[in-house]
Amino acid sequence: HHKTPRRQRQMCIRDRPYLAGSTNLIFKNTFADIEYILTTCAENGTRFEIECYDIGHLYTLAHFADRGIVKPPFFIQSVFGILGGIGTDPEDVMHMKRTADRLFGDQFHWSVLGAGRHQMRIAAMAAGMGGNVRVGLEDSLWIKPKQLATSNAEQVTQVRKLIEGMGLEIATPDEARGMLKLKGADKVGF
């Protein structure tokens, strides 16, 4: 695995103080906070994308589901390769999927995102396991090793070729909206 030398990281931080904010930031997400967010959003008809950065997040979702605070079907986005979260080994991907299967049965849609250079490899693994994938510049700036992506569209085109090359089909936008029980742009007030 390629690691950025400590000195180079320090230079980036010194040169760009706004990047340094994440090195000592506490991300507060208490059970009371989560319950408030879930309850408030549900009251307003919000559909949740539940991002799970580690196995414990699946158990947190199960806790709130068992209490009736959040209702299935769930859209679970497993996130791989973020510092402090689950890794990018194939065993990690399988463990997240198996745990979600055990906890939620057929009451969830599973999608993945792989951060940084792991994006396409994680997408391929999940697609092969029947999962959905998410790609884009929010998650990775790279299209391939040492080459920056030019756009989200370039990454979507690449993952589409990858998935179709595996003999799998891509959902249409209407199929995806139906799967996720979304209204569609023509039925919202903005």
Per-segment meaning from a language model:
Residues H1-I13:
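Single conserved hydrophobic/aromatic residue that forms the stacking wall/gate
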Residues R14, F48-E51, P72-S78, F108-L113, ...:
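Hydrophobic faces of well-ordered beta-strands that scaffold small-molecule active sites
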Residues G21-C41:
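Active-site glycine-rich loop that binds ribose-phosphate moieties when present
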